[in-house]
A protein has these predicted regions:
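A structural motif corresponding to the C-terminal lobe/cap of the Radical SAM core domain
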Residues: 2-169
């Protein structure tokens, strides 16, 4: 009912920051996201004809490679409801609580960024995360079509104009 009202009001797309497909990771990060509710929302938005730009974050301190595979499974199970994907690698904010509890360093000498490189508690380093995203997740037969239709320089401001591409490619 709510999603149909959104569509009727002119909503063409919603960006949903689901972050992870593993409930334990979401709970450890205090995200307040329930995967059963996220699943129901994806289905309801699809039925209403509203495109979904799903945001998933990999390499957070509580995530393991096995957890990332569960996120892949979540995306695959919901692939018909996800129009576009934003797959990101976690950046550790320099002054965060996590930064104080992890072994950190600058990304490179002279780095003035707001983020720090860190030693992942489970050994799930950025290179491993990047390889997982590029070589496994993006190449999965259910995920690859979503990646292909997601514009390269995509921003949520422009996404509604590309919603019609949902079933192409």
């Amino acid at each position: 009912e709510f999603c149909r009202a959104l569509k009727k009001s002119g909503c063409a797309m919603l960006k949903l920051g689901m972050e992870s497909g593993h409930q334990g990771v979401l709970d450890a990060l205090s995200k307040g996201i329930d995967l059963a509710e996220a699943s129901a929302a994806l289905r309801a938005l699809h039925r209403a004809g509203i495109a979904v730009y799903g945001y998933f974050l990999f390499g957070t301190p509580p995530e393991t490679e096995a957890d990332a595979h569960e996120t892949l499974d979540f995306i695959v199970r919901h692939s018909e409801y996800i129009s576009f994907l934003n797959l990101a690698i976690f950046n550790l904010p320099a002054g965060s609580e996590e930064a104080r509890s992890l072994s950190t360093q600058k990304f490179y000498e002279g780095d003035l960024s707001l983020y720090r490189s860190f030693l992942h508690p489970a050994g799930w380093q950025r290179g491993n995360v990047r390889n997982f995203i590029e070589k496994i997740l993006k190449k999965h037969p259910a995920v690859a079509p979503i990646i292909r239709r997601t514009p390269e320089f995509f921003t949520s401001n422009h996404a509604p104009f590309f919603a019609f591409l949902k079933n192409s490619k």
